[in-house]
Design a protein with these regions (language model features):
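Gly/Gly-Pro-rich "capping" loops immediately C-terminal to redox-active cysteine motifs
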Residues: 624-657, 661-664
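Sequence/structural segment immediately N-terminal to covalent heme-attachment motifs in c-type
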Residues: 603-625, 649-654
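Blade/loop signatures of beta-propeller domains
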Residues: 25-68, 224-235, 383-384, 455-456, ...
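Short, conserved, GDST-rich strand-edge loop motifs in beta-rich repeat architectures
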Residues: 190-202, 242, 269-289, 424-459, ...
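C-terminal capping alpha-helices of c-type cytochrome domains
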Residues: 146, 157, 607, 646, ...
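Extracytoplasmic beta-rich repeat domains
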Residues: 72-83, 113-137, 165-180, 219-257, ...
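Repeat-blade elements of multi-bladed beta-propeller folds
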Residues: 40-44, 77-99, 125-152, 176-197, ...
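Electrostatic cytochrome c docking/interface patches
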Residues: 28, 590-614
Length: 691
């Protein structure tokens, strides 16, 4: 009798659980397996980062039957930009402030939730960071997250309990993490952000995936020569810098775009822009400034330098190369090349031989006026005179948003096409009001060495497209106009489909070969995350996080025109299946700010200008350029708190809303508070009664 009870209990546990425990061991072999499509094991699905799934149950013929299988409300979340993982029927994702959840991928039931308490750990760094994360990693039964405050945390995938934790940054510095960690060969690697808020010297670090112990670190730019260089690569790089660059950090932070290449046992690191942006300040005598805006290949076991390719020598526009690096076998000149594909901010699409870093081709995928072309013999861009704002200012395409930002592109080996969300908008690069010799690096506020974040961006200033690109011919095959300007990454499948969410809240499927629009649904909020697909018991699912977020929201009216007002529209995780019957849950219609003018408030123009300076350094990253919120935080022009000096001080200086993610600015004196209030009232009045 006891044996029978034990047998029935064991059977119940196996059947009742949403997955068979331990069925898939996620390691190098499974992460490199392109044929297995039931799981989504890594940020880009596999090591190749193609975001291509071999699943084809949902295809060009059946996609019109797609419907909602389940959805999960996420009322405590704000920005949802991440890629979920799916392992044996369990979906894992990170939400706001790095809160991580495991969900039954069949039903949407939450199995566990892990809160790393990022707000508490962040301290003053909360002033300079966003709440969102692009994803997480999975390795041998552990979910590994990178918290926004700079920690790596390994979580038991079954229980949701912490296994180990390690701090990857100096918490006294203005560093944070929004990128997804990557795992390979028993290690987990992560970089960080903070180039605009600190005298930042970028680096990537690999840790033991079982213990969290540091394995190796690679610095992206050289430090002070007087301290000696860490390796020969840094000594080589230092020859490309001038002046006392180390006092400004140099930059190069790798906040996204790290790919493991198993065929060459190397890690490919896409590096960031300069700290500060303006090369006239950080390297006044010129120079290429290695390894800014580069792809750097490192030995996966030791972290030693192997080769590099620099996309923007002497970077001065925030044209970083932190975008995803996709691996593929491509035919060039009758030969099959182990290639990488990369579309950084600068507007060119690169195909590079990943065995040695040799440039194979590079062509423009959007409007570019800083360079005419890339010379294939030298591998260098041919710059257009004046683009470095040598005379103090210049209108240049693209803007710091780039032609392509971090939103993931996908590659379909069946069509041979890459699907890229692109942006077309310029920026006025200007440093006429800056003393280039006395400029000092920021510390917990924004400082780029150019005038930035001081104005609203009009609704018609930027456009966006979904571009299908042939990487061999280096030409457009098809494209679709998208709502401006912040649209998420793509997914492509063996069903001859491309899926993409949109800034206006639509989720759309296209024919991957022809670009024909086949299916769409409106989900009630702006979409900033890419979809994933997986299969359970022979049924294909597609899941997507919906929650407007990311740096594009700082663009004021350009982002606000969609009406995704802060705190109004619900955040959700949607999952679609063939013949899904659930109705899309209701969501409020688009809502727009209603600025409040106080007619008897006498605006002091000098105070308001000082307030603009403070706002551009400390507030616009969340509340939007020109005091126009793009939806990430409250629009201060309509906030009742900004009508009361005492209430405003209580929030801004005393930190009364710290628990909700509003940082504390204890350093603000009366002049800063009054300046901000006068600036907000000025911008509100402009909106109500005109300029």
């Amino acid at each position: 009798m006891e044996l029978r009870r034990a047998w029935f209990f064991s059977l119940f546990m196996i059947i009742g659980l949403p997955y068979a425990a331990g069925a898939t061991i996620v390691d190098d072999a499974t992460l490199a397996d392109e044929a297995e499509g039931d799981n989504w094991l890594a940020y880009g699905r596999t090591y190749a980062e193609t975001r291509f799934s071999p699943l084809d149950q949902i295809n060009e013929d059946s996609v019109n039957r797609l419907g909602v299988g389940w959805y999960l409300d996420l009322p405590t979340d704000r920005s949802l930009i991440g890629t979920p993982l799916v392992v044996d029927g369990i979906l894992y994702f990170t939400g706001s402030f790095s809160v991580t959840r495991a969900v039954d991928a069949r039903t949407g039931k939450i199995l566990w939730e892990y809160d790393p308490k990022s707000i508490e750990h962040a301290g003053d760094r909360l002033r300079i960071m966003w709440d969102s994360s692009r994803g997480l990693a999975y390795w041998k039964g552990k979910v590994i997250i990178a918290t926004i405050d700079g920690r790596l945390v390994a979580i038991d995938a079954k229980t949701g309990k912490r296994v180990w934790e390690t701090m990857t940054v100096d918490p006294r510095r203005a560093f944070y993490i929004t990128g997804a960690p990557k795992v390979f060969r028993g290690k987990v690697i992560i970089g960080n952000g903070g180039t605009e808020q600190e005298a930042a010297r970028g680096y990537v670090t690999a840790y033991d995936a079982e213990t969290g112990k540091q394995a190796w670190r690679f610095w992206i730019v050289p430090g002070n020569p007087a301290d000696g260089f860490e390796n020969e690569a840094m000594a080589m790089a230092a020859k490309t810098w001038t002046g006392e660059w180390w006092k400004h950090g140099g930059g190069g932070n790798a906040w996204n775009g790290i790919t493991y290449d198993p065929e060459f046992k190397q890690v490919l690191v896409g590096t960031g822009n300069g700290s500060p942006w303006n090369r006239k300040i950080r390297s006044p005598g010129g120079g290429d400034n290695l390894f800014l805006c580069s792809i750097v290949a490192l030995d996966a076991d030791t972290g030693e330098y192997k080769w590099h390719y620099q996309t923007v020598p002497g970077e001065t526009w925030d044209y970083n190369s932190n975008m995803d690096i996709v691996l593929a076998d491509l035919k060039y000149g009758g030969q099959t090349i182990k290639a990488l594909m990369h579309a950084p901010k600068n507007g060119f699409f690169y195909v590079i031989n990943r065995a040695n870093g040799e440039l194979l081709s590079a062509e423009k995928i959007g409007k570019v006026t800083w360079a005419s072309h890339v010379d294939l013999k030298s591998g260098r861009p041919v710059e257009i005179a004046g683009s470095r704002y040598e005379d103090g200012e210049e209108l240049v395409w693209p803007s710091p948003y780039g032609v392509h930002n971090w939103h993931a592109m996908s590659y379909n080996p069946n069509t041979g096409l890459v699907y890229i969300p692109t942006i077309e908008m310029p920026a006025l690069f200007k440093d006429t009001g800056i003393d280039l010799k006395s400029w000092s690096s920021p510390h917990f506020y924004v400082g780029t060495g150019v005038e930035f974040g001081r104005a609203d961006t009009p609704a018609d200033y930027g456009t966006a497209k979904l571009l299908a690109w042939d990487p061999i011919k280096q030409q457009k095959v098809w494209q679709h106009d998208l709502p401006p300007q912040w649209n998420p990454g793509t997914l492509t499948t063996a069903g001859n489909l491309v899926f993409q969410g949109r800034a206006d809240g639509e989720f759309v499927a296209y024919n991957a070969e022809s670009g024909e629009r086949l299916w769409a649904v409106k989900l009630g909020s702006g979409i900033s995350a890419p979809p994933v697909t997986y299969a359970i018991d022979g049924k294909q699912y597609i899941s997507l996080l919906v929650g407007w977020g990311g740096a594009g929201l700082i663009s004021g009216t350009l982002a606000a025109q969609h009406g995704w007002k802060y705190g109004v529209h619900p955040r959700r995780l949607f999952t679609f299946i063939l013949d899904g019957k659930l109705a899309i849950p209701p969501s409020p219609p688009p809502a727009f700010a209603e600025p409040i003018d106080v007619p008897d408030f006498e605006i002091d123009s000098a105070l308001a200008e000082h307030g603009l300076d403070v706002y551009a350094e400390s507030c616009f990253l969340c509340h939007g350029g020109g005091a126009v919120s793009g939806g990430y935080a409250t629009d201060l022009r309509e906030s009742p708190i900004a009508l009361s000096r005492d209430a405003f001080r209580e929030v801004v200086v005393d930190g009364s809303k710290l628990a909700k993610g509003m940082p504390r600015f204890r350093q603000f004196a009366d002049r800063e508070i009054d300046g901000l209030l006068h600036y907000i009232r000025r911008e509100a009045r402009k909106a109500v009664v005109g300029n």
